[in-house]
């Protein structure tokens, strides 16, 4: 399991080195499901400085998320990738790579979604690893939102085919390090709420293997 990083516990992370069952530190650079968030660069820097394990990062830029909230359209899940833009993702990923390299620490970028991240991370493979999810390799906008509505809502979001194609380029050229599930199921009654009150995420653990084998 991951240990959740916060601004308040950043100074204590070195003590986790021998913690049994802890595979790494989880850092939310952008707000998602739940209330874990380390958004400020000084706090992110402190997490990496004190971490004795790999830091796995939900990589979205909180400042851009907040600035883009005005782009959310009530009842229209198509606005989800407009709010949580590709700029939001690559801005955060560049910052995480810079901080990890500064401290010579290992970072794992979770569930990347953009062509910009594929191109950037292909040039920063040292201590930086990253994953792609089956859902981002299977469906893309706008069709996914047309057909599935809020069932296709996740963070970071499903994007258009240009991003989908570049993610597959990464897989075919062995640029990504792993396939990750980003397992985040919700009750049907909640997923069917009107956007943006619907929660982000979908199941992944039980579907990762058959979906990827089918590809």
Regions found by a protein language model. Give the residues of each.
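Histidine/acidic-residue-rich, glycine-tolerant segments that coordinate divalent metal ions
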Residues: 1-99, 116, 137-140
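His/Asp/Glu-enriched, well-ordered alpha-helical/loop segment
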Residues: 77-104, 173-179, 184-215
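Electropositive phosphate-/nucleotide-binding environments in soluble metabolic enzymes
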Residues: 10, 38-41, 86-94, 111, ...
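Divalent metal-coordination and catalytic microenvironments
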Residues: 25, 58, 107, 131, ...
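Short catalytic-loop micro-motif centered on adjacent basic/acidic residues
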Residues: 1-2, 106-111
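Binuclear metal-ion centers of metallo-dependent hydrolases, dominated by the metallo-beta-lactamase
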Residues: 110-120, 124
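Active-site loop ensemble at the mouth of alpha/beta enzyme cores that anchors a bound cofactor
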Residues: 72-76, 126-130, 134-173, 185-208
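Glycine-enriched alpha-helix->loop->beta-strand junction motifs that scaffold or abut catalytic
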Residues: 18-25, 51-54, 101-103, 124-129, ...
């Amino acid at each position: 399991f991951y240990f959740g990083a916060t601004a308040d516990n950043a100074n204590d992370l070195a003590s986790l080195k021998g913690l049994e069952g802890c595979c790494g530190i989880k850092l939310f650079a952008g707000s998602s499901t739940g209330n874990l968030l380390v958004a400020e660069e000084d706090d992110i820097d402190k997490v990496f400085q004190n971490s004795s394990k790999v830091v796995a990062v939900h990589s979205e830029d909180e400042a851009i998320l907040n600035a883009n909230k005005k782009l959310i359209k009530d009842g229209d899940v198509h606005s989800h990738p407009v709010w949580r833009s590709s700029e939001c993702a690559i801005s955060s990923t560049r910052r995480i790579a810079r901080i990890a390299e500064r401290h010579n620490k290992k970072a794992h970028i979770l569930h990347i979604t953009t062509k910009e991240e594929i191109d950037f991370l292909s040039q920063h493979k040292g201590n930086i690893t990253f994953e792609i999810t089956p859902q981002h390799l299977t469906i893309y906008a706008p069709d996914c939102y047309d057909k599935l509505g809020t069932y296709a809502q996740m963070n970071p979001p499903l994007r258009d085919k240009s991003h989908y194609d570049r993610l597959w380029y990464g897989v075919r050229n062995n640029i990504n390090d792993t396939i990750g599930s980003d397992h985040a199921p919700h009750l049907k009654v909640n997923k069917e709420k009107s956007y943006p009150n619907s929660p982000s995420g979908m199941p992944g653990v039980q579907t990762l293997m058959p979906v990827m084998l089918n590809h």
